[in-house]
Structure formats: structure tokens, C-alpha cells
């Protein structure tokens, strides 16, 4: 009985190719067809026919590729790759509403083991195990009947390819205008079609990565300090906090009805409620905000082999330190002193390879005590990174309940998810306030200042979208609206003649973005270079300091 059950089923080669082409093109593209139905109402016979033609085209293309691969005995291997890739893509699209593009591949490649583990759920294991791994095993397990004679088999397969091509041509002849209009007006659709989405996105990512060995482009070689910043007994110390996945919409400083910023509300900070990000993923936003390029002209390839903000600040003679708790600086700190404090795995601060952001302060007191000269300290936080929002804050910050204490966020209610996320913001409030108090405790030696800016926002199930990383052109504002604030000590305001009331007024009425960080940090630290743009320096209109 067992022997009979384990006996390998046998299919002819054409039947095998047709079966697995259908599975890949139709069964692993449910996410694609669901998205098509959102943009193509079936309110006419023509639209119904256009929709029906889509799986026909997908099947024809996959069948052509697998059949041609069969001539060089690669059909099984290629089918398995398509199945595994398609199953994974479909799961994440259906579960989190993501889009498979280059930035998503970059996110995946930058994902830490801890982040990968956080995504692992019973639903994910079961879904990928059945639709991906099991299907791939079956593709190898099914025995293909040897073709006799081979010439006839070859002719049959060529005929299959020709018929598939003919079907594509016929669909194009009848529905080209419909396809062109649909995909032109809904460019994100093609990024839901497997396995082409993963193939194109991976190739695009590789094309960018291979440029990493290009020679370094130096900028700001004329960098020097404003002489007025060097006068006086006190040195200058600035902390720049790079936030992670914090939404401007959830900061009470910006009008959010919940009190998510109780500490910062007492710190006399300048909050900028109308701030947008450069990208919707850390891999894009962090290199962009530390570059001299505005978002509209940002060149990701150039940014990977060009100096940035911290290189210029360091060249001007300021001590720079980057403390990281978010999986790396994406190139922004490559040429300045930096350390991954997550790897310290401090007791009480770290769980399963991830740490609370308070770990970023480990050793900072000692570093500041021994700091000779001016300094800039960058704290790269893990902030509100999902989907394990409940792991971002210690138990005492669980203020808003009930919470979503699972990584299967799609199974939580909207109330639970927002409560959990808002608790992460409450902890962000604590971290930024702690940094301000750290600076205050060293005001006997330093004139101090602080900037906080999140890298991007987050979707919390609005319109069925979760997490972040959607293409900028179609991403919701929740992924692009980010919190930014500046704190200036009284000493800084007086010493460098900055009118805080002026800043508060401008902050509440004007629009800002991550484009402002580069020149604002140069101005804040008194670094002069031809790359500095006064129009982008937030403090400049309210500053009376001059040579």
C-alpha cells in the first residue's frame, strides 16, 4: 500500500509543462488578478473578455519559457524557481499589500536575521510550505515519460510554443488598447505579476549593486568651520537621531489627539508638522537624507559611491560617532567612526537579536566626557519598525491597550494595531527626551543641540496596506509624512543668535522635507562649504550669526 502511494506519478512532457505553467501563471497570481479587478470593473462584456485574457497571456508566456527550457533540460529547475519565488511574492502581497520592486529587494537584502524571524508566522510557514515548497517538490517528484521518438516530442513542444505565441498575438490584436490604458494608468499592477516582478526587481537591484566598486566621489573638500563657532570656552555638541518607521500622523506634537509625546511637550522643542521623506524605505531614505541631492534629483547609484554629510562634517574637524541599532547605516557612516550597539546584546535591553533603543546610550557618557573638540553623535534607532511593534518598547510603555502582541498584524483589529504602534511612539518620545537630558547634563562643557528626523512612515492597515516600501508615486501619505524636531539649548540660542520664536512660527506654517537635513546640519554645526545651500537651512532665516 505504502509502496503504491509512494510510486511516482508519470506525465508526458507536454502535460507536465502545461500543468505547471498553469499553476505558476494562474494559481500563483491570485494577488495580481485581485488587483486587476480593483482597477478594471467587470461592467461590460469587453472588460470581462480583457480580464479573462490575462491568465491566458500569463499562461502562454510561462509555457513558452518552460518549454524552451525543456530543450536544455532546465524546465524542472526553472519551474521550481518560479514556484518558490511566485509563492513568496504572492504571500507578502496578499498579506501586507507590498509591491515587489528594487527598493523591496534592497529591503530584503538589508533585513537582519532578527527581522526575518519576526516575519515568520504559522500562516507564513503553512502558506509557503504548501504553495511553494510542496509544489516545487511535486514538480521534481512527478516523473516525465521518456519521449519516443525524440523528434516528434521536439516538434510537439515547438508547436506548443508557437501556439502560445499566437495566443499572445491574438490578445494583443484585440485588446492592446485596453492593456495599454490599464497598465499605463496603474503602473503598480505589473509589479504584482509573478514571477516577472521578482525577476525584474532583482535584476534592477543587482545592476545598482554592481556599481558599488566605482571610485569614491569626494565632495565638500573646501569644508571649514565658521570662525564664530570656534570662539568661547564651550565646545559644541550635537546629537542627530535618525528615526525608523515613525509616522508624523501619530505624534501629538503635531496635533494627534493621543498624548504620545508627553516628555517632548515639556522640552521646548521646535516641531515641524509638515515634513516629508525622501523615500518609503530605509535603504532609500537614509542615503538620500545624508546626501547633498534633493529627492527630485536623487541618484541612488551616485549616492552609493559619493561622500555625504558626515564626511564633510568630519573633514571640517568635528568628531563624528554613529551608534546603530537598526541594521546598518546604508553607507551614510562608512567613512566615520561607527559601531553596531545591537551586537552588544546587553542584558535587559536585547531580545532575540533585537534591542530597545535605550541601548544606543551605552557608553555615551564616557565618550562625551573624553571628547576633545566639537562633536556630532548620530543615533540610528529601530524606532517603530514592524511587524513586531510590540517588541519595540519595554513593558512599562504599554500605555495604550489592547495591543497586537503578534507578528501576524493582519489578524489584529485596527484598534489593537494602532494602540501597539502608538506605544512605540511613546517610547520614541522617551528616547529623544533622554538624549536631550543627556545634552543638558553636559552643558557645563558644551553648547548643545539636537535634531530628530524619521526615515519614513508606515501603513497600519489603511486600505489593506501594511508596513512600508511602496513606490513613492503611489505610496500613501502615512508612509511619507514623517516627524522632525529640533531642540536648541538656551546657550545655543544666545551664543549663535537664533530666534526660537521665529523658528516656531515658520515650523508651524511651512513645508519641509528630508532635503533640508543636509544644509541644516551644516549650518547648525557651523561648517562652511560651497555645497551648503542657505535656502535649505531651516535655521538660516532665524539666525543673525555672521562672520
Swiss-Prot record:
SUPFAM superfamilies: Alkaline phosphatase-like. It is a multi-pass membrane protein. The chain crosses the membrane at residues 10-30, 48-68, 80-100, 124-144, 155-175. GO terms for cellular component: plasma membrane. Pathway: Bacterial outer membrane biogenesis; LPS lipid A biosynthesis. Its EC number is 2.7.-.-. Keywords: Antibiotic resistance, Cell inner membrane, Cell membrane, Lipid A biosynthesis, Lipid biosynthesis, Lipid metabolism, Lipopolysaccharide biosynthesis, Membrane, Transferase, Transmembrane, Transmembrane helix. Disulfide bonds: none annotated. Belongs to the phosphoethanolamine transferase family. EptA subfamily. This is Phosphoethanolamine transferase EptA. It comes from Salmonella typhimurium (strain LT2 / SGSC1412 / ATCC 700720). The gene is eptA.
Amino acid at each position: 500500500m505504502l509502496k503504491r502511494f509512494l510510486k511516482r506519478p508519470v506525465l508526458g512532457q507536454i502535460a507536465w509543462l502545461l500543468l505547471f505553467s498553469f499553476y505558476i501563471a494562474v494559481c500563483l497570481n491570485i494577488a495580481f488578478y485581485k488587483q486587476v479587478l480593483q482597477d478594471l470593473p467587470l461592467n461590460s462584456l469587453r472588460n470581462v473578455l480583457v480580464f479573462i485574457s490575462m491568465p491566458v497571456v500569463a499562461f502562454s508566456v510561462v509555457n513558452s519559457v518552460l518549454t524552451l527550457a525543456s530543450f536544455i533540460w532546465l524546465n524542472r529547475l526553472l519551474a521550481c524557481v518560479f514556484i518558490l519565488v511566485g509563492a513568496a511574492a504572492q504571500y507578502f502581497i496578499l498579506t501586507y499589500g507590498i509591491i515587489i520592486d528594487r527598493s523591496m529587494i534592497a529591503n530584503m537584502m538589508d533585513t537582519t536575521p532578527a527581522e526575518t524571524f519576526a516575519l515568520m508566522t504559522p500562516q507564513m510557514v503553512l502558506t509557503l510550505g504548501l504553495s511553494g515548497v510542496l509544489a516545487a517538490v511535486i514538480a521534481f517528484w512527478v516523473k516525465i515519460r521518456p519521449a519516443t521518438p525524440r523528434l516528434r516530442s521536439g516538434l510537439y513542444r515547438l508547436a506548443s510554443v508557437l501556439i502560445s505565441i499566437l495566443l499572445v498575438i491574438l490578445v494583443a490584436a484585440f485588446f492592446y488598447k485596453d492593456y495599454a490604458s490599464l497598465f499605463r494608468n496603474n503602473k503598480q499592477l505589473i509589479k504584482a505579476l509573478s514571477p516577472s516582478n521578482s525577476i525584474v526587481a532583482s535584476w534592477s537591484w543587482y545592476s545598482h549593486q554592481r556599481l558599488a566598486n566605482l571610485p569614491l566621489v569626494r565632495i565638500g573638500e573646501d569644508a571649514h568651520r565658521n570662525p564664530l563657532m570656534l570662539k568661547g570656552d564651550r565646545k559644541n555638541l550635537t546629537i542627530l537621531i535618525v528615526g525608523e518607521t515613525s509616522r508624523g500622523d501619530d505624534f501629538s506634537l503635531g496635533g494627534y489627539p493621543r498624548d504620545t509625546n508627553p516628555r517632548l511637550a515639556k522640552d521646548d522643542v521646535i516641531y515641524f508638522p509638515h515634513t516629508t521623506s525622501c523615500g518609503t524605505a530605509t535603504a532609500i531614505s537614509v542615503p538620500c537624507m545624508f546626501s547633498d541631492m534633493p529627492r527630485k534629483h536623487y541618484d541612488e547609484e551616485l549616492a552609493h559611491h559619493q561622500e555625504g554629510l558626515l564626511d564633510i562634517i568630519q573633514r571640517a574637524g568635528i568628531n563624528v560617532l554613529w551608534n546603530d541599532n537598526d541594521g546598518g547605516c546604508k553607507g551614510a557612516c562608512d567613512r566615520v567612526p561607527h559601531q553596531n550597539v545591537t551586537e552588544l546584546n546587553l542584558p535587559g535591553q536585547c531580545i532575540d537579536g533585537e534591542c530597545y533603543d535605550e541601548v544606543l546610550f551605552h557608553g555615551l557618557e564616557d565618550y562625551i566626557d573624553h571628547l576633545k573638540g566639537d562633536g556630532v553623535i548620530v543615533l540610528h534607532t529601530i524606532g517603530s519598525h514592524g511587524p513586531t511593534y510590540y517588541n519595540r518598547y519595554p513593558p512599562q510603555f504599554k500605555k495604550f491597550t489592547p495591543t497586537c502582541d503578534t507578528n501576524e498584524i493582519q489578524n489584529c483589529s485596527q484598534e489593537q494595531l494602532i494602540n501597539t504602534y502608538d506605544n512605540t511612539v511613546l517610547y520614541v518620545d522617551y528616547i529623544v527626551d533622554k538624549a536631550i537630558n543627556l545634552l543638558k547634563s553636559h552643558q557645563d562643557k558644551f553648547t548643545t543641540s539636537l535634531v530628530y528626523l524619521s526615515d519614513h512612515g508606515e501603513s497600519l492597515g489603511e486600505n489593506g496596506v501594511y508596513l512600508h516600501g511602496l513606490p513613492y508615486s503611489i505610496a500613501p501619505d502615512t508612509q511619507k509624512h514623517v516627524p522632525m524636531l529640533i531642540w536648541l539649548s538656551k546657550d545655543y540660542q544666545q551664543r549663535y543668535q537664533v530666534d526660537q520664536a521665529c523658528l516656531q512660527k515658520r515650523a508651524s506654517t511651512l513645508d519641509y522635507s528630508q532635503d533640508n537635513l543636509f544644509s541644516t546640519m551644516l549650518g547648525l554645526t557651523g561648517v562652511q562649504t560651497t555645497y551648503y545651500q542657505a535656502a535649505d537651512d531651516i535655521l538660516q532665516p532665524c539666525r543673525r550669526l555672521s562672520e
